[in-house]
Amino acid sequence: MSLPRFMIAAPASGSGKTLITCGLLQALVDRGLRVASFKCGPDYIDPMFHSRVIGARSKNLDAYFVDTPTLRYLFGRTAEQCEVSVVEGVMGFYDGVDFTVTDASSYDVSEKLDIPVILIVNSRGASLSTLAVLKGFKDFRPNRIAGVIFNQMSQKVYDALAPEAERMGVKPLGYVPKLKDLVLESRHLGLVLPGEVEELRDKLKRLGQELERTVDIDGILEMARSASDLDYSAPAVGRIDGTVRIGLADDDAFCFTYEDNIELLERCGAEIVRFSPIHDAHLPDVDGIVLSGGYPELHGEELESNRTMLDDIRDAIASGMPCIAECGGFMYLHERMEDRDGVERRMVGAIPGRTWNTGKLCRFGYVTLRPADEGGMMGSRPVVKGHEFHYWDSESNGTDWEASKRGTTYRCINDTGTMLAGYPHLYYYSNPEVPLGFLRRCAEYRDSKD
């Protein structure tokens, strides 16, 4: 199948990938094109920026979480609905899950999906040296680097260097000058949330217009359309009998949700009912709850003041309604949560004790997980992959699942049989038996109400 596509990658983080990706997305949307966007790796925040531009939820592509056929499916089923797909890389182009491998890197994804790559080379404080960087990346190993955009470069320098890049076999596709008033600010958990960037839409609009002036958008589209055909098929997954209604927390406090997780729940028999623990007075009529990650610590007062919602969720869990809670959602289930200002807030109370800010990164990175025994929600011991990134710690991290990463094994997650709650974010397509096991519990709860 013909799926026009290209990847924006860079030698390192901080090169301007997200800024330029958002600008290109805006320019393509302004041309009236139907655009799909993707982010390599497990990051939630960059796709949220993409979504503000394209008006639809952006997706993740992670070669650590899934095998190649599944990766191709997750890409293809969205890309086929659009005229062009834009993939933003992660970290440095060749940086993988360990220091000396390219597994799960942007490079790995580009190879598995046959994507032409445009390298963003940050030229701040350099001129000719940027070509040495470009040549090094081009020659490091066989790759799909087909074009280059120079960031923080003047037109005068670009005009001098572009012919040299072309002689290397890399198409020069333009430059981005220094744009002090169009910077997307950073903070402790990556980029700020889209809703917190003042006048973001105006910024992105102006950014798209600037890139139309200095970047060869037509050349990028030509490159995207030259990508080879990509075949894919949907992986087989199980399905429960009938349908269960799943309440999905979805607001400014609980906004870290993989759209592919939601799609898989639907394939397995879920009807998704989105609700807001901040704004809605009551939990909707559902058979199960998914409390996503996010930033509950930024909304502690609002969450605490919504007593009817807190009571509804506590009572539902106590009655046996199945619940999966990850990171921020796990924090919300505690008796008490320290907010960003150090104020201790009363929360749901389904998890004993408190969660507090340690002032440092507690855990970070990919993790492989499985139940410690067969007595929990899954009724077996399926292996599932996920990732962790949190500054808050808990008095009740749980010991019901085993986690492993880089040769280290530790216990985590509270698994009561109907409640699965802990800091790790799970990626369902890494093992569809996990969401299916959750929905089976939800179906049992549904039937118990009849």
Identify what each model region corresponds to.
Residues 213, 240-242, 254-264, 271, ...:
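C-terminal and late-domain segments of enzyme folds
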Residues 296-373:
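Cysteine-nucleophile active-site neighborhood
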Residues 2-19, 25-113, 121-144, 155-159:
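ATP-dependent carboxylate-amine ligase catalytic core
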Residues 244-318:
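Phosphate-binding active sites in nucleotide-utilizing proteins
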